[in-house]
Amino acid sequence: MRVLGIETSCDETAVAVLDDGKNVVVNFTVSQIEVHQKFGGVVPEVAARHHLKNLPILLKKAFEKVPPETVDVVAATYGPGLIGALLVGLSAAKGLAISLEKPFVGVNHVEAHVQAVFLANPDLKPPLVVLMVSGGHTQLMKVDEDYSMEVLGETLDDSAGEAFDKVARLLGLGYPGGPVIDRVAKKGDPEKYSFPRPMLDDDSYNFSFAGLKTSVLYFLQREKGYKVEDVAASFQKAVVDILVEKTFRLARNLGIRKIAFVGGVAANSMLREEVRKRAERWNYEVFFPPLELCTDNALMVAKAGYEKAKRGMFSPLSLNADPNLNV
C-alpha cells in the first residue's frame, strides 16, 4: 500500500510517500524557522501563507519521482495545530484524493508523532509508555496492545517546548529555543543554579512549566554577573529532571518496561543522555526516533495514515481541521 502523507500543522511544510508502512520512497520538508526568527516565534498567518507557497512545490517534486496514479491513499494532518496552517494541507489532500479517486485519511498530529517511533523501530510492539514533548504538547500516554492511546498526564500550562522558547527569549538567544539552549547549555554548568521542579513530587502525571519560566525571569532580574551558559544549562536540567522522573514513574507504576520519547524536544541531547542512563540503571528499554523524525515531518503522517487505512479507518471528505484535537 502506497500512502502519500502531507504535514502542515505548524511551521514545517512536508510531503512524503511511504510504501507498506515501512519503505520510504519520498520525503521532503521545508522549514520556516528563518521566516519566523525575526518575530521570535511562529506567526500563524505567515505560516499559512508559506505553506500555500511551499506545498505545491513539494507535491510537484514528489510526483516527479512517484507517478500520482500509483498512490493508494492520501493522508494529512487535520489537528491539533494552527487552523490556517492545517487547512492548507488538509484542503490539498482532499483535492488530491478526489482527483486521483483514492481514499482519504485524516491524521491526528500527536498520534503521528507516536507512529514515528514505530516507523524507526519496526520490531517495537506495545504496550509502552510514550512521552510526547514538543513546542505545542507535553503529554504522557499509554499505548496498549491494540495500539490505542490513552493520555494519562499533560501540561497544565506551558508545554516544555514553549518553556524553552520563552527562556531562550529571556536570555537573548533567539528562536527556536530548544536547539539553541541545547547547544549553549553544553558550555555551562547544569548544577550552577537551582531552579524549581514544579509538580515533581505531585502524585499526578501532569506537568507545569510556567512557574519554572517565571523563576528564570525573576533570577535574571535579580542577579548580576551570571553566565548565560550556566543559566541555560541549569534551566534545561530542571526541565529534563521533571520529564524523566514523571515518565519513568508512570512506567514503573503501570509495570511497563518499554518507554518511547517523541516530538521536537525528544531531540534534546541532555534528555536523551539522562533517559539512557536511567534506563540502563533500572533495566528499561527506551526508544527515540532519529532526529529528523522528532520534528514535524510527513513520514510520520504517512505511517499513521497507513495504519488507519490498513484497518479500513478512512475519513469523510467533510472532515474539518480541528486546532484543539485530542488523542
Curated annotation (Swiss-Prot):
Top-level taxon in the UniProt lineage: Bacteria
Keyword 4Fe-4S: no
Subcellular locations according to the entry: Cytoplasm
UniProt catalytic activity: L-threonylcarbamoyladenylate + adenosine(37) in tRNA = N(6)-L-threonylcarbamoyladenosine(37) in tRNA + AMP + H(+)
Cofactor: Fe(2+)
Keyword terms: Acyltransferase, Cytoplasm, Iron, Metal-binding, Transferase, tRNA processing
GO molecular function per UniProt: iron ion binding; N(6)-L-threonylcarbamoyladenine synthase activity
Cofactor note: Binds 1 Fe(2+) ion per subunit.
The keyword Cytoplasm appears for this protein: yes
Alphabetized Pfam families for the sequence: TsaD
Major location (coarse): cytoplasm
Gene Ontology biological process terms in this record: tRNA threonylcarbamoyladenosine modification
Family stated for the protein in its record: Belongs to the KAE1 / TsaD family.
Role: Required for the formation of a threonylcarbamoyl group on adenosine at position 37 (t(6)A37) in tRNAs that read codons beginning with adenine. Is involved in the transfer of the threonylcarbamoyl moiety of threonylcarbamoyl-AMP (TC-AMP) to the N6 group of A37, together with TsaE and TsaB. TsaD likely plays a direct catalytic role in this reaction.
Protein name: tRNA N6-adenosine threonylcarbamoyltransferase
Protein species of origin: Thermotoga maritima (strain ATCC 43589 / DSM 3109 / JCM 10099 / NBRC 100826 / MSB8)
